[in-house]
Amino acid sequence: ADMGMNIAGGAYNFGYNTGDAGGHSRVESGSGSSVAGSYSYVDANGDRRTVQYTAGPGGYQASGDVGVDRRTAAAAAALAAMAPKAPIPAPAAAPAAPWYNPVPVAPAIMAHPGGYIAKW
């Protein structure tokens, strides 16, 4: 693996290259609030993918191999088509209309069945 770095006066640059089967590499430089660089790698299909980027007050902008790999996407779409589909839920029934059911209440005072008898 190769690596280099330089920092001076608020600016920097660095880079590395792994040199392995994954072929990872990256270079970047920046000054103040702006950064520019690129990275690359070898994807699962054996293709080298390279992305260039800049970042600063306007946000992050990438170009190059930033899209989906067409071969991988086609295989993924075929597999997704075979996957079981989620059931479509039945529409929920509307709630029942409110209704009123009065409950009979015993009176608070009841007459005695034998009448009232006063004893003095």
UniProtKB/Swiss-Prot annotation:
Keywords assigned by UniProt, alphabetized: Cuticle
One term under GO cellular component: chitin-based extracellular matrix
Chain segments annotated as transmembrane: none
Protein's UniProt name: Adult-specific rigid cuticular protein 11.9
Organism: Araneus diadematus (European garden spider)
Molecular functions per Gene Ontology: structural constituent of chitin-based larval cuticle
Keyword ATP-binding: no
Residue ranges annotated for the Chitin-binding type R&R domain, each copy included: 9-87
Primary role: Component of the rigid cuticle of the spider.
